[in-house]
Amino acid sequence: RIGRRQRQMCIRDSDGIFSNTKGRPLGMAFDSEENLIIADAVRGLISIDRDGKVKTLSTKSDSDNIPFKFVDDLDIANDGKIYFSDASSKYGYGSDRLELFEHTPNGRLLVYDPATKETTTLLNDLYFANGVALSTDESFVLVNETWMYRIQKYWLKGEKAGTSEVFIENLPGFPDNVSSNKEGIFWVALFNPRNNFVEMSSNKPFLRKIVLRLPELLQPQPIRHSFVLGLDESGKIVHNLQYQSNKAYSPITSVKQYENHLYFGSLTHPGWGKIKVPK
């Protein structure tokens, strides 16, 4: 579980607090040695061992020497390499709206190699690099571009290795996290449906600057809308799960499949959501 304590974020086990990152943990996964690897928006890429000891793995890219500002999500390959996103190299955690309304490509997809302890930038100029997920055979990795309503695909193997292409674009909402069920389906959590004002102001920077000066309560707000898509590994939508209601579990910012259920997480909604995997 993730719990908040005096504005610091703690990893909790069933008996209480297991470890305190003193930052803001977001995406996480266990490596082959049962260390919990965490994309911490404040601390960077970190590792927590079985005893709860926190170790910093990386705080900047060694290939371009640019420090992280907003490490967001990760996935770990069978060879131990950690693929992760830095949502923005300009704005830190809590400044999502600035990144949205400025609409500049400050995000990156990176890889950390535990064998060499080096971090390499794979893709840059992304519009809020968010969720990260490897394909079933690990021939490619996906990274969500939240503010462009699309998902990028970076090839790791084969003739296209080292190149990228759009996996899917023109999504009906803002893609947040993405995960693979390792059976050919990517589950994508959409924070919210597309916003009319964001669409209209996309090529009007002066208007976006005016809105940013307004109190947050007067700025465009998300609606109560649960939204998850299931994509096959060719980028085709095979599941479209939506529910709009004042009682909706929203916003959904992460989704994971475990056996026959989907589990939903949210940055703002207390608790977890759960439904059966649709047929």
PLM regions and their residue ranges:
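Blade-edge beta-strand/turn elements of extracellular beta-propeller
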Residues: R12-G16, D51-P67, L110-G131, Q152-L171, ...
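Blade-level signature of beta-propeller repeat domains, shared across WD40, Kelch, NHL, RCC1
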Residues: P251-K279
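Beta-rich, blade/repeat-based domains predominating
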Residues: S14-L36, S63-I82, S89-K90, H103-L109, ...
